[in-house]
């Protein structure tokens, strides 16, 4: 089962990804972790990434897709994986699709956690106020201002992925504003039919 979980910052992707990993026994593949591991291992693609990072450049989509391609060949990913932090753009989604197709694979499901962005901002503001009320400092990345910037970046860059996968017929949506356990139950209901197709 090959899964992508989409949703804005604060939607609960981290929590739900952990539960998917536990339920289906597939690894969560974080592009950041994979990059660091490839660099440390000195793989051809890792060496290429290292040179780019050391020069202060951004690692290209081609390099990231190459790292994902290497990682999914490892034994623990044979039954599938959940991608974390990738793809972030439609161009990356297209490159990922081409790479999987070249291996005779495809995505099982792309699930978007749908949330009310105003409610998310409200949650962050409430959390910041509670932290201040306890006499503690609010972490810079937990301030409502920074959170709003992250939401805007998501809307501009990553939100178009929903339309891209919807057009391909692979997008499923789950209401991310529900209690955490209800979100998990809805996610499992969406994902479990794909598990049977893989097993048969």
Curated annotation (Swiss-Prot):
EC number of the protein: 2.7.4.3
UniProt xrefs under InterPro entries: Adenyl_kin_sub, Adenylat/UMP-CMP_kin, Adenylat_kinase_CS, P-loop_NTPase
Keyword Cytoplasm carried by entry: yes
- Enzyme class comes to transferase
Give GO cellular component annotations, separated by semicolons: cytoplasm
Renumbered residue ranges of the record's region LID? 126-142
Under Pfam families, the record lists:
ADK
Which residues are noted in the entry as ATP-binding? Answer: 10-15, 127, 178
Positions annotated to bind AMP: 31, 36, 57-59, 85-88, 92, 139, 150
Localization, UniProt = Cytoplasm
Q: Which GO terms describe its molecular function?
A: adenylate kinase activity; ATP binding
Keywords carried by this UniProt record: ATP-binding, Cytoplasm, Kinase, Nucleotide biosynthesis, Nucleotide-binding, Transferase
Give the start-end ranges of region NMP: 30-59
Catalysed conversion reaction: AMP + ATP = 2 ADP
SUPFAM superfamilies, per the entry: P-loop containing nucleoside triphosphate hydrolases (SSF52540)
UniProt superkingdom: Bacteria
Question: Which biological process terms from the Gene Ontology are attached to this UniProt entry?
Answer: AMP salvage
| CDD domains the UniProt entry points to | ADK
Assembly, in brief, is: Monomer.
Q: According to its UniProt record, which protein family does this protein belong to? A: Belongs to the adenylate kinase family.
- Comment, domains: Consists of three domains, a large central CORE domain and two small peripheral domains, NMPbind and LID, which undergo movements during catalysis. The LID domain closes over the site of phosphoryl transfer upon ATP binding. Assembling and dissambling the active center during each catalytic cycle provides an effective means to prevent ATP hydrolysis.
The role this protein plays is:
Catalyzes the reversible transfer of the terminal phosphate group between ATP and AMP. Plays an important role in cellular energy homeostasis and in adenine nucleotide metabolism.
What's the protein here called? Adenylate kinase
Protein species of origin: Methylobacterium radiotolerans (strain ATCC 27329 / DSM 1819 / JCM 2831 / NBRC 15690 / NCIMB 10815 / 0-1)
Q: Per UniProt, what is the name of the gene that codes for the protein in this document?
A: adk
